[in-house]
Curated annotation (Swiss-Prot):
Keyword field contains Flavoprotein: no
Localization per Swiss-Prot or TrEMBL: Cytoplasm
Catalytically driven reaction(s): phosphoenolpyruvate + UDP-N-acetyl-alpha-D-glucosamine = UDP-N-acetyl-3-O-(1-carboxyvinyl)-alpha-D-glucosamine + phosphate
GO CC term, one of those recorded: cytoplasm
Matching PANTHER family: UDP-N-ACETYLGLUCOSAMINE 1-CARBOXYVINYLTRANSFERASE
Protein name: UDP-N-acetylglucosamine 1-carboxyvinyltransferase
Keyword set, alphabetical order: Cell cycle, Cell division, Cell shape, Cell wall biogenesis/degradation, Cytoplasm, Peptidoglycan synthesis, Pyruvate, Transferase
Residues with the 2-(S-cysteinyl)pyruvic acid O-phosphothioketal modification: 117
Binding-site residues for phosphoenolpyruvate, renumbered to this chain: 22-23
Superkingdom classification of source: Bacteria
InterPro entries documented for this protein: Enolpyruvate_Tfrase_dom, Enolpyruvate_Tfrase_sf, MurA_subfamily, RNA3'P_cycl/enolpyr_Trfase_a/b, UDP_GlcNAc_COvinyl_MurA
Main subcellular location of this protein, as a coarse class: cytoplasm
Length: 424
């Protein structure tokens, strides 16, 4: 098993490029299942564990896949299965994205209940509700979601999501693009990753309007085609790298970004006293002499992202004053808190929010990753901690960050990957 060994205390400086977004790549890859027509070519696909798992799933279904130098080529002309098995789906909750495309194309699919990060409830109710609204009969039996179309194809419908859900919005989009008639998605997710999926589906021939708003209107089409497409860059990775600059007192430029996708995060950095400048696709952050405490509440886009909440908690351990952190999306997403406290942080849980007392001097020790963003949080803490921090179980980190230790090392961090034996 792999761990990251970090010797903290180095101010980071320099320029680093953002990778392609995992959270947009996965639904885009799933959408290639919608048509047997041609071979897709998709650029800027990050080489991550979750992407590799999704490729395995496509290959299991019968797709021909080539992945090299961040370019993915997919042909779904000869699929042999409509079932996504537990052995693959258990590794990653985003596997649920195959539900809509397989149902739309074949009229029947069986998808194992998903896995992924182990924090809080992960209901699939909104995905099921969307498929049922479009005319499918859905049952859950023996750990599988079994969905069947009543008739020759799905039928357009009005779907009003009770809460904003990126996953359910994506699945509903992919199911609706070839449905008969018009589908209206109300309270659709606003995240840039959904806009990216919409642009991809449009390029394939889908008829979608209202992109970038909470109301998406889809007029079903009879046929879609394979296309070339460029994935968007990863706003969460960019935010994490900027956080590494802020926590170490450094100055870092992240290129290849879409700065407006990070508006709420950049605002929070500025409130903390950081100097943040934007020029074209580049964001430069210079840390202040003293970080100021900033309260954040994680909510759906365009508010502060839940996927940056853990990293922000690490940063606030160094702020001169107390701060509060609330997560309105995943109320229990605080698995990183005990490990931060092991490093010397002073963080308390009050009901469903965290109180971070700062500043606290952190001292390196062994800490264990529990999920993807918790791993990133512990890496940031290790960068500022005295002595040596060992972040164990970094397979979580590899699910969402492409060679992050290489990027941090290039910015001046003393960080390396090592193998270790974990005792059962």
């Amino acid at each position: 098993m792999n761990k990251l060994v970090i010797r903290g205390g180095k101010k980071l400086s320099g320029t680093v490029a953002a990778s392609g977004s995992k959270n947009s790549a996965l639904p885009v890859i799933a959408a290639t299942l919608l048509t047997p027509d041609g071979t897709f070519g998709i650029n800027r696909i990050p080489d991550l564990k979750d992407v590799r798992t999704f490729i395995q799933l496509l290959e299991y279904l019968g797709a021909a896949v080539s992945f090299e130098n961040n370019r993915l080529e997919v042909s779904s002309s000869d699929l042999k299965s409509i079932e996504a098995p537990y052995e693959l789906v258990k590794k990653m909750r985003a596997s649920i994205y195959v539900l809509g495309p397989l149902l739309a194309r074949f009229g029947h699919t069986r998808v194992s209940l998903p896995g992924g990060c182990a924090f809080g409830p992960r209901p699939v109710d909104l995905h099921i509700m969307a498929m049922e609204k479009l005319g499918a009969t859905v049952t859950i039996e023996q750990g599988f979601i079994d969905a069947k179309v009543n008739g020759s194809r799905l039928r357009g419908a009005e779907i009003d999501f009770p809460i904003s859900s990126v996953g359910a919005t994506g699945n509903a989009l992919m199911a609706a693009v070839t449905a008969e008639g018009k589908t209206v998605l109300q309270n659709a997710a606003l995240e840039p990753e959904i806009e990216c999926l919409c642009r991809f589906l449009q390029k394939m021939g889908a008829n979608i309007s209202g992109i970038g708003t909470t109301t998406l209107v889809i007029e079903g089409v009879d046929q879609l085609k394979a296309v070339e497409f460029d994935n968007i860059f990863d706003r969460i990775e960019a935010g994490t790298l900027l956080g590494a600059a802020a926590i170490t007192g450094g100055s870092v430029t992240v290129t290849g970004t879409v700065p407006e996708h990070l508006g709420s995060v950049l605002d929070a950095f500025r409130q903390a006293g950081c100097i943040v400048t934007v020029k074209d696709d580049a964001i430069t952050l210079t840390a202040p002499e003293e970080l100021q405490p900033v309260d954040i509440t994680a909510r759906p886009y365009p508010e502060f992202p839940t996927d940056m909440q853990a990293q922000w908690m690490a940063l606030m351990t160094q702020a001169h004053g107390d701060s509060t952190i609330i997560d309105r999306i995943y109320l229990e997403r605080f698995n990183h808190l005990p490990e931060l406290n092991r490093l010397g942080a002073h963080i308390e849980i009050r009901d469903n929010w965290a109180l971070v007392h700062g500043p606290q001097e952190l001292t390196g020790t062994k800490v264990m990753s529990t999920d993807l963003r918790a791993s990133a949080c512990l890496v940031l803490a290790g960068l500022v901690a005295k002595e040596t921090t060992e972040v164990l179980r970094v397979y979580h980190l590899d699910r969402g960050y492409e060679s992050i230790e290489k990027k941090l090392s290039a910015l001046g961090a003393d960080i390396k990957r090592e193998q270790y034996q974990e005792f059962s």
